[in-house]
């Protein structure tokens, strides 16, 4: 028997669908700017517009779009809040383009200074830990702070994905960092939420970043 407190509110599913349709009236009409004079398919962050998504990426389909919002970070100086935009686009190839930009916020929630920035690609590859059985997510990132990071992971379900650092390469000017674990998921209201933990000087995973971003495009 279902406890009274767990009973879904009557009509809640219909309202969720209606709210999603209302959001799509704005987000579904937008896309990222592109040059239209190139001879190859343009990047698109809107599944309604442009070239079709590769079948090999269907398990990552919910990520496609432009996402904006705020989050919380922690570094050697303490906790801080940041704003962020993530662009997830494709050109019909077997990978997703990824670009994330963030900026620190002051105590009043206004822009303070540039923060982390990363760009890279998501794709599915033969799982290096289980080459005969499964496909793994591969995420290759270049960070503006001077290092390249390779993640492998897997979908947890149709709308969440977990990744762990497999390798790091740092430039001479790059920030010294440890590996990370990331969890992304589509949460209530269709937002994109994520948490990142990084290995600290003591060798353990500690909270580093978390954010909840609303769909702006797609």
UniProtKB/Swiss-Prot annotation:
Q: What reaction does this catalyse?
A: peroxynitrite = nitrate
What cofactor is this protein dependent on?
heme b
Describe how the cofactor binds.
Answer: Binds 1 heme b group per subunit, that coordinates a highly solvent-exposed Fe(III) atom.
What the entry lists under InterPro entries is as follows:
Calycin (IPR012674), Nb(III)_bact/plant (IPR022939), Nitrobindin (IPR045165), THAP4-like_heme-bd (IPR014878)
Regions of compositional bias (Basic and acidic residues) in chain numbering:
7-24
Give the residue interval(s) assigned to the motif GXWXGXG.
65-71
Taxonomic superkingdom: Bacteria
What EC identifiers does the entry list?
5.99.-.-
Key words of the record = Heme, Iron, Isomerase, Metal-binding
UniProt-annotated stretches for the region Disordered: 1-24
Q: In which pathway does it act?
A: Nitrogen metabolism
Question: Which molecular-function annotations from GO does this UniProt entry contain?
Answer: heme binding; metal ion binding; peroxynitrite isomerase activity
Question: Which Pfam families does this UniProt record tie to the protein?
Answer: THAP4_heme-bd
Annotated residues for binding of heme b? 181, 208
Q: How does it assemble?
A: Homodimer.
Domain notes per entry: Forms a 10-stranded antiparallel beta-barrel structure able to accommodate a hydrophobic ligand in its interior. In fact, this fold hosts the heme group, which is located in a wide surface cleft.
Question: What does the UniProt function comment say about this protein?
Answer: Heme-binding protein able to scavenge peroxynitrite and to protect free L-tyrosine against peroxynitrite-mediated nitration, by acting as a peroxynitrite isomerase that converts peroxynitrite to nitrate. Therefore, this protein likely plays a role in peroxynitrite sensing and in the detoxification of reactive nitrogen and oxygen species (RNS and ROS, respectively). Is able to bind nitric oxide (NO) in vitro, but may act as a sensor of peroxynitrite levels in vivo.
Family that this chain belongs to: Belongs to the nitrobindin family.
Q: What is the protein name stated in its UniProt record?
A: Peroxynitrite isomerase 2
Say which species the protein is native to: Mycolicibacterium smegmatis (strain ATCC 700084 / mc(2)155) (Mycobacterium smegmatis)
The organism's lineage is:
Bacteria, Bacillati, Actinomycetota, Actinomycetes, Mycobacteriales
